[in-house]
Amino acid sequence: MAMVYIKMSFHNTIVTVIDGRANVLSWCSSGVCKFKGRQKTTAFATKIVITRALKSVLERGFNGIDIKVSGPGFGRNVAIRAIIKMGFKVFSLKDITPLPYNGCRPRKRRRT
C-alpha cells in the first residue's frame, strides 16, 4: 500500500508518493510539468501532476492508497477524483493542514 502526500499552496502543487517503509516511489510538482506562473495553481495542473506522479506507482503494482492533503490550495477535489479515476482503492483520506491554536503574536496594526 502506498501513501500519497499532496501539498497544495496558493502558488504550487507538490505530490509525493511513498511506500510502507517511507521510501519515495515518485514525486512531481507543477513546475516539473512545465506549468509556469499562475497556471501552476489551476485544477488542470493539479490533475496532470497527480496522473504523472501516480503512473509509475500503478505500473509497480500498487492498487491501495492512503491520501494525505495539506495546504489551502485549489483543486483538492480534482486531485482526489483523479486518483480514483486511475483505478486506485482509497483506504483513507486525511487533511493534515496545520492550524495554529493562537500561535505567534501578530504584527502591530497599521495606523492610517
UniProtKB/Swiss-Prot annotation:
Pfam families the UniProt entry points to: Ribosomal_S11 (PF00411)
Q: Which organism is it from?
A: Euglena longa
SUPFAM superfamilies referenced in this protein's UniProt entry, alphabetically: Translational machinery components
Biological process (GO), any one: translation
Question: Keyword annotations for this protein?
Answer: Plastid, Ribonucleoprotein, Ribosomal protein, RNA-binding, rRNA-binding
Q: What is this protein called?
A: Small ribosomal subunit protein uS11c
Tell me the protein family, please.
Answer: Belongs to the universal ribosomal protein uS11 family.
> What do the Gene Ontology cellular component annotations say?
plastid; ribonucleoprotein complex; ribosome
Q: Where in the cell is it found?
A: Plastid
Q: Which domain of life is it from?
A: Eukaryota
The UniProt subunit note reads as follows: Part of the 30S ribosomal subunit.
From the Swiss-Prot or TrEMBL record, what is one GO molecular function term? Answer: structural constituent of ribosome
Q: What is its main location?
A: plastid
**Which InterPro entries has this protein been placed in?**
Ribosomal_uS11, Ribosomal_uS11_sf
NCBIfam families, per database record: PRK05309.1 (NF003698)
Q: Does the keyword RNA-binding apply?
A: yes
